[in-house]
Amino acid sequence: MAFDYKKEYKEFYMPKNKPGIIEIPQMNYIAVRGKGNPNEENGEYKNSIGLLYGIAFTIKMSYKGTHKIEGFFEYVVPPLEGLWWQENTQGLDYARKEDMHFISMIRLPDFVTKEDFEWAVQEATKKKKQDFSKVEFFPYDEGLCVQCMHIGSYDDEPTTVDLMHDYMKANGYELDITDTRYHHEIYLSDPRKCDVSRLKTVVRHPIRKTE
């Protein structure tokens, strides 16, 4: 049976729909950076998703080819994630989606090295006749965070974020969004197949102890 990161690491991917504090260890991702409204057809964000899955499935299916990854085991591709920010803005202003910057990403299993990633980019480029040069190997050490499961429209996330920030302050923490620590979303539902009222998204914000 394929290893499923969502089920094996429920604390990261399946939190309760009430806020909690969690320490996130460093993980490696495949990632694509971009800017613009995530809802724009053929925009940078939607294009980034296609690039990510092209590499993710090349790595996932590598065991069927000649490139052997040391320590490989069969697994379910982890969910799509996104780091989001806007210039000169603490958090996100959902009314200014065109100003959003993002790092779209998918977690890599620990056994995938940078060399394996580089092989996958070359292999996908050759087989799919597509440019994957925007995809990068991205280690991210997220650290201490407050997180919560948000159920419903992405545009309603501010309500969940307010709950997270109230919980954070009540427990002696403050927000620590910086140039290297971001508003983080993990997408557990496919918006093309799920009613908007039932979308499940993990929302995560970096924090630090209040001095």
Where are the regions that the model predicts?
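A solvent-exposed interaction/effector surface
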Residues: M1-E211
